[in-house]
Amino acid sequence: MRAGLATTLLFASAFSHAGCFLNEHLEPYYGRVVVPQSQQFRWSDGGLPQTFDPAFAAAPPDTDLVRAIFEGLTDYDPQTLMPVPAVATKWEASNGGRTWTFYLRDDARWSNGAVVTAQDFVRSWQRTVKLGELAPHTELLANIEGTEKKAAVSTTQATPQPSQPPRPASSTQATAREPQQPFGAEALSDRVLRVRLRRPDMNFPALVAHPVFRPVKLDVDAPAGKLLPSGLLSNGAFSVAETDNERVLLARAENYWDKQQVTLQSVEFVGARDTESALAAYRSGGVDAVTNAALEPLAIKLLAPYTDFRRTTFGALTYYTFNTARAPFDDIRVREALAIAIDRDRVSTDETGGATEPAKRFLPQTPTEAPKTVVGKSDMLEKDDERARQLLAEAGFPDGKNFPVVRLLVNRNEQQRVVAQAIAAMWLSVLNIKTELVIKNWDDYEAAVRSGDFDVVRRGIVMQTTDELTNIRTLFGEGYPGTAAASETERLHQPGAEPSEANKLFGPAAKPSTTRPAIDTEAQALNDLSAMPIYFASSYALVKPYVTGFDANVLDAPSLKKVRIDGNWKPPASPASNNAR
């Protein structure tokens, strides 16, 4: 409440000084715009980075720093999110997409001048796998051969509460591994890396753009130790220059193979106590960009008219999973009826205050993706009351007669309660189906999910990649436990919550125990509908108009390589000056 009040007062003060009421001219930018004379990018990114290690980076600002100082086999084009060459100049698939060969460039160097080799990638990936649950995104390597493991003796730890980081595995915990194949990443030479996968993945080059796949230079194999900034060797466009309690300063890397294309001389991650101080720094001209600030719906509405305010769909999905082990939710007609009776546009607009985007499919749309093929239905879950009632009648429940009360399980969270009540009202209005809303604290909620004590349950995921197989297997596959991003998704919409509080909120996402055919594609997921998407989160940024190349995307993963300060930027002519002419 205190943080929310402070934000409201901050905006009220800002608007009154700027003369931004409805009957006055609205300034185009939020705060002072003074073009810097140097190529230094000052970035308030939700706090200061807490780790410099690709294996331990869970979320921004840690992942943003890792992307700046380390480079992987591929990188994302920040606009299209297509994989582009990085350390690897080219790659090729064989064996139906189960084997990938990457060819490394000759001029890739570490910051000490040493050559970046294929073996660096092998050792780094093996280190991450050995870290297990200590590394927040180890599961992204799960499709590589030789990473399989089978739990025995001990029970699985519960997913951490949103207010707590995951606990390291107990030393008394026993884990038995199945007889393993050799590790699937192999250095055929210094310049050639071959990777064997458990399942075909034609989008694997997109997956390895994730920070967890970026190599580190290790003199000794110490898997449990985090890399420290002092003396850190890196291979990216920037290297660590200075660190203290108020900032992290990066400098353009002199040994980077593509340094001629890097305009920025330095990047400064600027610390901020909270959202209010970050916005105040931006308004006064102290920083060039603000991202990962916990903005309330009111603040979002007040910022929306400004030209330098950006809003982008973020790949954090809230979805509802059906317990298909229970009748009548084992009937696809029932699941589809419930799915298309929901007005997702209204949920996003009314129930979340316009702070989310309606999710009518499981994966956020990217600019270059091919259309989905869905048998006998639309590839989007559009509201269709007539078809929903028809499907329910075909399933034996005309006008909802004799349909059991739906037990809808959600974790204790005000926004999730409001959304669940709205969806329950839609089911009652369209299908004449009643709902019992079951709200539980986090531990009890997770226990109910594990035991299957629900008909429908609210879940969440923060997608780490555009790789379709990885995202869909995270949602639906036994071998891909994924992340318990319900807590992260909630954090994005909780007033007063800061991004740095949630950097480690990743753990296994529980699934209903019923055995079902494997789902590897979004088209299969839309055909099966064992779960239904509800909404995507949104990410927000304030970026000064003289900053170019800072592109937002659904992964919330901007690249610094093409960012520059346009020293020749001039404000557009105001309507008043045009009329004077």
Language model regions located:
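N-terminal lobe/hinge region of extracytoplasmic solute-binding protein
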Residues: 43-95, 126, 230-234
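Extracellular/periplasmic solute-recognition and catalytic clefts
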Residues: 241-249, 268-326, 349
